[in-house]
A protein has these predicted regions:
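Extreme N-terminal tail/first-helix region
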Residues: 1-14
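Left-handed beta-helix
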Residues: 12, 17-18, 23-24, 29-30, ...
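Phosphate/pyrophosphate-binding betaalpha-module
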Residues: 46
Length: 119
């Protein structure tokens, strides 16, 4: 869905489950998947999701107007009901279910964030 003349750029191989909302300045790489009721809202800044990344059910990805963009690397798994806000998750990382990552957080390559974490 476009917002303020910004339209998502979604590769043809991306899977978007029912109820998924991708809004504004969002780019999603090859073979990634966004599952049921995921919201990617890039209304005031951009969101970039790499290739082969899996965003599971009920996750919210959002940005802050004056804060950092959201950058999610390649081959990342984001568990159910995660909130990612203005953060960076590097390649081959796992974000556990119910975690909340706030503005400025950087998760390193091949890292695991335990379920229910607040960073």
């Amino acid at each position: 869905m476009s917002f303020n003349n910004k339209k998502p750029m979604i590769k043809p191989s991306v899977f978007l489950a029912d109820g998924c909302r991708v809004i504004g300045d969002v780019s999603i790489g090859d073979d990634s998947s966004l599952w049921f009721n995921v919201v990617c809202r890039a209304d005031v800044n951009s969101i970039k999701i790499g290739s082969r990344t899996n965003i599971q059910d009920n996750t919210i990805i959002h940005v802050n107007h004056k804060g950092p963009k959201v950058l999610i690397g390649n081959s990342v798994t984001v568990g159910h009901q995660v909130i990612l806000h203005g953060c960076k998750v590097k390649d081959q990382s796992l974000i556990g279910m119910g975690s909340c990552l706030l503005d400025g957080v950087v998760v390193g390559e091949k890292s695991i964030v335990a379920a229910g974490s607040l960073l």
